[in-house]
């Protein structure tokens, strides 16, 4: 069952730490799931699309650093906060290099934890919205004809209708028709909105002609 609500996924081999973090976050009204190992979390990782992850660095079987590497390979979208021992700066730096959004040194205050989690949840929410928008735009692009895509590329490149018509060997009036169809199919409110969506989807990066 997919996790669609913003949930904090706590990963730590120490049960006392898991319970303490769950209590701290739960007291702030944040929903929590706990896992005794990175391996246990990876089993459900494909169903986790929102929220954030809090993981200890030093764990048996699979460390927090190893988990970050796995998540990076999977292109997993959920932000990760890493918990490190006091003074364990090299591991913290490695974690950030692998994509962690923050690290917390033990011991840390409740306020520090909550601030970090809320920031990660906000980032995750923004990332999810961007991904959803991109997916929707790509679906609309897939419904365009090859000619409509050619016209769209011309518009995104800033070409005038007459120039696009000349390049494609058709009349400017036909370009106007294609342009009107593009606005409808792409659900664009304006030409600038159409161009914005095309840029998000990387239309100019396409090698199609």
What name fits each language-model region?
Residues 59:
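Receiver (REC) domain active-site loop signature in two-component systems and cognate sites
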Residues 56, 84:
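Active-site residues of response regulator receiver
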Residues 180-209:
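Basic, Lys/Arg-enriched C-terminal extension of HTH/homeodomain DNA-binding domains
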Residues 88-90, 104, 108-117, 163, ...:
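C-terminal output helix
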């Amino acid at each position: 069952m997919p996790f669609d609500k913003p949930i904090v996924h706590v990963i730590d081999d120490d049960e006392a730490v898991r319970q303490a973090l769950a209590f701290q976050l739960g007291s702030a009204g944040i929903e929590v799931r706990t896992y005794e190992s990175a391996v246990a979390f990876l089993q459900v990782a494909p169903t986790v699309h929102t929220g954030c992850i809090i993981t200890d660095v030093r764990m048996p079987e699979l460390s927090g650093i190893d988990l970050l590497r796995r998540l990076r390979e999977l292109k997993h979208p959920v932000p990760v906060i890493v918990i490190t021992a006091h003074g364990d700066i090299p591991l913290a730096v490695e974690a950030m290099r692998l994509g962690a959004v923050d690290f917390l040194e033990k011991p840390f205050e409740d306020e520090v934890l909550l601030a970090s989690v809320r920031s990660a949840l906000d980032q995750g929410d923004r990332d999810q919205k961007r991904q959803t928008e991109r997916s929707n735009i790509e679906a609309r692009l897939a419904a365009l004809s090859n000619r409509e895509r050619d016209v769209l590329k011309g518009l995104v490149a800033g070409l005038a209708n007459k120039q696009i018509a000349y390049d494609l060997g058709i009349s400017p009036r036909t370009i106007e028709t294609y342009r009107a169809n593009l606005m409808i199919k792409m659900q664009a409110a304006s030409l600038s909105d159409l161009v914005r969506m095309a840029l998000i989807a990387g239309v100019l990066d396409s090698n199609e002609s």
